[in-house]
Amino acid sequence: MNNPVFLSGLNKIYSRFDIFFVDLWGVVHNGVECYSNALKALKNIKKSKKIVLISNAPRPSNNVQRFLNKINFRKKFYNLLITSGDLTRFYLQNKNKNKNKSFYHLGPNRDKSLFINLGLKKTSLNKANFVVCTGINNNKDSLNKYFSILKKIKKKKLKMICANPDLIVHRGNQTEYCAGSIAKLYEKMGGKVKYFGKPYKYFYEYICKILKEKYKKKINKKK
């Protein structure tokens, strides 16, 4: 399926699929509270189908689950939760040529769980071999604040790993920039970026790999 199909309700496609991928932010919650109708829909789907929550949160899924618990979104509403943070960790641990080298973290301290037990050393920009971007440091920051640091990163010709490709997010009534906006700005400056998360193919391949291992079934991607 190459083009999106706009539906009036899930009942139009419900019988065609065994597993539903459901985004979190903007679909299930707004960063502050859950949408009651979304919870009702998930509860009905889970009666006979499997639900996989997917998120561009630049943190491990267990960390995101703790946040979901705070807004009363419980495990009973889904089967699996997979984040762009999970994929980023998988890459840094298994695929990254910079393994065991030093990195500079461009992002808030709340995302530090992304790097736990990876065998990587967090360091200053001057000593870094590559950069991991997880977002803006303060929710109210504008992109202009990051021109200076991006120029320094570009001067050192460092590759950037973007752990959240989203450009913006709405937290309640507030709009915030995400790591994707910083990464796109770095690309415009001529920097190299590798993205992990929606809508990139690598993320969905990673999810299908996990599902195949967990449920011992081959995923029919053509459907």
PLM region descriptions:
Residues 1-223:
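HAD-like aspartate-dependent phosphatase fold
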